Amino acid sequence: MSTTSFAWVALTLAGVIAVTAATTAQAQEAVAGSAEAGAQKVGVCLACHGPNGNSVNPEWPSLAGQNAHYVREQLRLFRAAHRSNVVMAAQATALTDQDIADVAAYYATQTPAGLEADPSYWKAGEALYRGGDRERNIPSCKACHGPVGLGNPAAGYPALRAQHAVYTIGQLKQYAADARYVDAAGVQQKSRNGHMMTTISKRLSEEDMRNLGSYIQGLR
């Protein structure tokens, strides 16, 4: 398969999934979110996710600028125990649909803090993020997450820009180990884009993950 054909297939696949995901997302957005109301509800979130959604601990994700569709979906998964995390499960259980909508709307309006990419790794990360690897059937990350990591809000693809490299690497490893979307008993659960990310992550080496994590951290 030529490079052009490979890119076309990757983009076509992303487009088909985006249409399906967008339809699902629209059905889930029946409750309108208020960023102003969300600002009054994120007090407990600050301890881990930082002021204005910019985490200071690289183990915990920054949420500033994350698209609301994605935050809603993840909070619902935590609430339903379809994504296992002791801290998040406890917090999400108490949230109503309105709370989730408001919190998601708030974080979507916040500005990501600028982080720097590790100069030792970001070049290789850029090549994989933007061009993929045809020989290993790894599509470019930008096909779904955009050239500067803004994601695709309508399709539910998350923004990646300025995310901590440590967190990104950890999530890629979870996908590769079939551990990203599991319940407390370790049973695999469904998610909108989980299967695609699991398939791709299994093709990544630890070096690939490190390079991608560094490049993504430096995206603006």
For every predicted segment, state its role.
Residues 128-139, 182-191:
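Intrinsically disordered, low-complexity Ser/Thr- and acidic-rich flexible linkers and loops
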Residues 35, 53-83, 89-94, 142, ...:
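Gly/Gly-Pro-rich "capping" loops immediately C-terminal to redox-active cysteine motifs
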Residues 155-220:
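Structured core of small recognition/catalytic domains
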